[in-house]
Structure formats: structure tokens, C-alpha cells
């Protein structure tokens, strides 16, 4: 997930010009890959290209920190029919090609316990560079609720502030 990294890893500041850019991984992924802070890591991902071609790309990162799995949130990933609602990884029905034969028992166990909770977090600016499309550079905007605030009042307050700045 592309996020303001300091929200899940306080003390880690992402500098946009830093090369390779930082990535924060959860402790499950760190154990699986046997990595720690300071190690290099290559991220492989898909990018939609016009006209609807799915292309595999890779990017290099430096592990800036390891956080507990609880630092993540399964709601960071948008709901995606055919994926989010699948009871198992083997049950995925994505609209893009994927080799489900690569799914290991450990991956199924992760899905069962944590669903769409991200395993890695990159700075939002880097995510926008990597995954920007003709539809935009963000899939969602998350607005945290401060202690003592009511979440049901958040849409009204956000709309008021947005209108005031237009």
C-alpha cells in the first residue's frame, strides 16, 4: 500500500528523492523473506496500460523498518469484487490473469487471518509515480478520526471544509 509511512511507522520519514526509496514491511513478511531494516528488496507488481494491457514491473526499495502486523489495516485496500469477498486465495476470481499455482499454504493462512491487510507500505508519492493511471493517482483517501471525534460526523465536517476551500 502507498501511504504516509509515518502513520504506521512513527519516526520513519520518507524523503522523496531517496534512492532506493524506503519500504516498511510487516513482521510476517520480514519473517517469510528473512529480511530486516536496511536490506534491499525488489517489489514486483502489475500496472494497467492502455488499452487494458496488464504489464509486470519491478522497483527496488530499501527496508526502512519492520512493523507489527497490527500496524496494518485490511481496510487500506479497496473492496474489489472477486477478490475481497473470496473465502480463500484459491477462490479469487480477478478480472486479470494471475498464477494461483504460486499460492503457498502460508499465503492461504495469511489470507484467512488477515485478508487484505497490506504486507508492505511505500511512501504515497512513490506509489503515485508507480501506479498512476488515466483514472488518477489515488484509489482512496483515508481521513483519520482524532481521539474524541465521532466518525459519523466526519463526512459532514469534511464536506464543509472542502467547500470552504473551493
Predicted regions and their residues:
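Alpha-helical transmembrane segments of bacterial inner-membrane membrane proteins
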Residues: 1-166
Amino acid at each position: 500500500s502507498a501511504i504516509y509511512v509515518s502513520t504506521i511507522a512513527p519516526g520513519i520519514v520518507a524523503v522523496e528523492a531517496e534512492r532506493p526509496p524506503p519500504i516498511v514491511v510487516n513482521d510476517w513478511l520480514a519473517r517469510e523473506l528473512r529480511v530486516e531494516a536496511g536490506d534491499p528488496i525488489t517489489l514486483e507488481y502489475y500496472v494497467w496500460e492502455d488499452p487494458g494491457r496488464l504489464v509486470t514491473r519491478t522497483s527496488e526499495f530499501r527496508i526502512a523498518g519492520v512493523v507489527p502486523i497490527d500496524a496494518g489495516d485490511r481496510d487500506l485496500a479497496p473492496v474489489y469484487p472477486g477478490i475481497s469477498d473470496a473465502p480463500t486465495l484459491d477462490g479469487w476470481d480477478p478480472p486479470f490473469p494471475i498464477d494461483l499455482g504460486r499460492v503457498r499454504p502460508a499465503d492461504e493462512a495469511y489470507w484467512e487471518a488477515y485478508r487484505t491487510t497490506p504486507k508492505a507500505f511505500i511512501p504515497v508519492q512513490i506509489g503515485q509515480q508507480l501506479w498512476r493511471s488515466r483514472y488518477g493517482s489515488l484509489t482512496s483517501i483515508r481521513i483519520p478520526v482524532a481521539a474524541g471525534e465521532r466518525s459519523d460526523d466526519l463526512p459532514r465536517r469534511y464536506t464543509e471544509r472542502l467547500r470552504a476551500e473551493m
